[in-house]
Amino acid sequence: MDKELWIKRANDSLVKHFYEQQSDIEQREGFESKLTFGTAGIRGKFGLGEGRLNKFTIEKLALGLARYLNAQTNNPTIVIHYDIRHLSTEFAQIIANVLANHQIIVYLPDTYKTTPELSFAVRNLNTTAGIMITASHNPKDYNGIKVYSSDGAQLSTDASELVSRYIEEVGDPLQIDIPISKQNTSYIKPFPKSVTDDYMKHIQNMIGYIPKSDLQVVFTSLHGTSVPIVPELLKSLNFNQFNLVEAQCKPDPNFSSVQSANPEDHRAFDQAVELANKSHADLLISTDPDADRLGIAERDAHGHITYFNGNQIGALLLNYRIQQTSQLRHRLMIQSIVSSELTKSLARYNNVEYKEVLTGFKFIAQEIRQLDDHQNMIFAFEESYGFLSEPFVRDKDAVQIVPLIIKYASELKLYGKTLKDELEQIYQTVGRHEDTLFSHTLEGLEGKKKIESIMTHFRSNPPQEIQGLKVKAIEDYLTSEVYQLDKDTTSQIDSPKSNVIRVLFDEGFIALRPSGTEPKIKLYLSLKCPDFDDVAQKINAMIFS
C-alpha cells in the first residue's frame, strides 16, 4: 500500500483530523490492514489507508455494492439511513452519489434516523436493499456500514460474502473516479415522511394504550437517534409522565456527557439517576446511539437503583408477552445461543416453543422469515440488550420496546408491584438462573493474534469439569459438531459456521466467542448454582490467565 500517496490525498479523505490524532501504531495499522465486509458489514476507526474508514474506502464499498445490486436485479432501489456520528451524513451522501451513478434509485432522508426504522423502511418502500450508517455504541472515532436485504433483515452470510467479493474486485480505492452529473443525482429521492408515520402506527397498534398510573419515567437517548421519535411516540400514546435527560438528548458525535454510550454500562445511567432522584422517578430507560438496543433501571421509594442486565430484561419482556398472548396457539420465542437459560425455562414452563440461533439478529430474522402460517413469534432477543416484540421490523428495535416496558411497569404499579418484584417471581417459578459476561478488549494486530490463540487453546484442550461442574457436552459452531462426553459420541449441529464454543452442564452453560464488531473476546455464563459470582470469577480467571 502506497503510504505516501495516501498522505498526499489526506486533505480529500475527510479524516485528516482523526489521522493526525492517532498514535504511530494506530496510523501504521491503517496501512497494514484492510477493512473487510463481514457478516455485520463494515465497522472500524476513521483514518488513512485501506484498513480505516475514509472517503476512499467508503467509495470502494459503495462501488462494490452498486455492482452487486445491479447483478442481482434490474432497476434496484435502496434506502439509506444514518446516525449522529462523525461523518455519517457525509458517508451517506457519498454512497448515494455512487449508487445513483449506477442508476440505482436511492431514498435519502435529510436528517438522522434509527436503525429499526431503516429495517421497517426497506419493507415499507419495498426496496431491493437498505444501508444503515452507524457504529452502534462504539467509541466516537468509529463508524460503520450495515447492509440489509429486501425483507428488512441484515444480509445473510452468503450474500455478505458475495458483496465482499464485489468490493474486493474494485481494487485500489485511491484510483476510483466518481463523476457527478445532474442526470445521475436525479436518482436520489427524498425519504417519504409517510414511512415514519407508518412505523409509528405499527407501534401504536402493538401497544394499544398505556394504563393510567403514577409511574414516572426518565429517558435518555445517550446523544443518539431515539429523540425525537421516542418522546413523540409516547405522547401519541397519551403517556406524558416522563422527563428527558436534556443534556444527553441532543445529537452529539463526541458523546460528551457520557463515559460510555452503551446501555449495558451502568455509567451510561449516571445523569439519568441524578434526574430520577430529583423527580422521584420509578423507571429509567436508555437507548444506544442508533436506537436498536436499550437498557433499563428501576428506582425504589428509598432511592435505591436496580440495574437489569440484558437477560433479565429479556425474561421480563418474555413474561409480559406470554401474558399478552395467552389466547394464541403455537407461540414461539427466539433467542441467541449465548442468551440465558432463564428465558428457555420460562418458555418451557408456559408451553412456548423456543429456538436458539447464532449471535447476530440477522439469524433471528432468518427464523422469522421461515415461520409457517401457524406459528406466532411473540418475542425475540439477544442478551446484548437487543429485543423485538413484533416482526414488522426485522432487527432489534428499542423504539418499539420503550413503550412496551413502560406499559408493563404501569400495569405493575397499579398493583403496587415493580419490575424487580416481577423478576423475583420469575425466579421463584422457574429457578434462579444467573448470567454474566466477561468481555476482554485486545486491540490491534497483536490483540487479534491473542484472541485466536485463546480460541485455539480452548479447542485443543476441551475440559471435562470446570469448577466442580461436570461437562455434559461441548458444541463447536466452527466445526458444526457437538461432542457428548457421557456418551462419547459426536454429532452435527444444524447451524451456519461461527467461531463459538459452548460448554453445556446440567446447571447451564458457558460460551466463548470473539466479537464480530469489536476487538474483544467474550465469555458468557448462564448457570443455576450456589456461589454463582465466585464460580464465574474463577472460570474467567482460568480461561484468561
What are these regions (language model features)?
Residues 79-142, 239-296:
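N-terminal small/polar loop signature for handling phosphorylated ligands or for N-terminal nucleophile
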